[in-house]
């Protein structure tokens, strides 16, 4: 019996090491040449909870690598995904025409963004392969120069890449802008052994892919991804150029999610994928931008957003919290405070911190290790409950460690794919909250109903007023 129990326990431990309660369907590395269609495609990849963007490489094409890097980094920064690695392919000799629409259309704040210290794409890709063991889709939104470079220089690439998805704007495999950027790489890639899925652009037949109705619907979605694409259509240079309304490289994002909406013809290791369902594809854009590509919850389908569902004192703030901070923070906040059994400010801070960390890396739940320095003594330790719910990093999953240092701190470290950041509540915010709680405790005492009523009232106010992008210091540890 003892031997059986020992084997059983070892089996459980091993299962814990290798199991995962939920994983996205697609792990991707994206290569881009900086086109505005690439911006729409990348935004869609980032918006989908069923896709994990592990890294982005930039190569010459529509823009030079340096300018493409600036566009990509400014886009990621504007979406608060600063932790996604971006590398540069400087090997390709193609001289970019620097198309004005792509060059002049902003993706985010470019001030302070420079390609000077950007990592080499091969080094970056190699580091991704060393940490992520799930097979990857390598997506080429421009040329296949970077893909070919990786194939030549990373010996075990075939063990890590299950397919290449390449956007082709030509009528065949051997023509079009993306093919001609690096003809040698294109020709060699089409002859190698790993599957290549060649995704065609949507052929308009006198119909714009992004018609007025689709653009209108995108503008009503009210999240940071839809707002970024709406800003493109609102910009003077893009909205007055017909290319903005075509469905080109963003077909890669749609194909990854909805391959049945394409006519797929396979010959050898090459599959030609042609968009075929216009209505379905337009609806697919909306679904992706809304994040409706996978169920986010385990038991309930969705939490109501109707204020009347909630307690009377929080009803006036429901819509504002969701509009300002998104449905993820709202849902995590509701669940964390139900778990916590009272509405507390440090539980709310923990939720905001966890969502901010997930944003930084663009991860889902259960995907990184967290170490909390909030200790085990309330009220600061209440932050741990918010962290657990918002990140899925729980003690039961072995993903949350609580440090009991002599002096606790409203901070936590998050480690994902050999990268670590530390988030700390800004001192002035921490002092304001702590002083307020101490004063309420001094006046009313912890056993007073008035104390807990005022804590609840203040917690709702902090939930509504504290922006997670403004209240934390974010430090890169490594």
Predicted regions and their residues:
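C-terminal segment of classical bacterial N-terminal signal peptides
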Residues: 14-18
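Sec-dependent N-terminal signal peptides
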Residues: 4-13
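Non-transmembrane, aqueous-exposed alpha-helical and coiled segments at domain scale
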Residues: 260, 293-343, 349-478
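Hydrophobic alpha-helical scaffolding
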Residues: 175, 179, 243, 343-344, ...
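Short, N-terminal intrinsically disordered low-complexity segments that are rich in Pro/Gly
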Residues: 58-65, 243, 322, 339-347
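Active-site nucleophilic cysteine motif
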Residues: 245-254, 342-352
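N-terminal acidic, glycine/proline-rich low-complexity segments
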Residues: 20-306, 394-395, 477
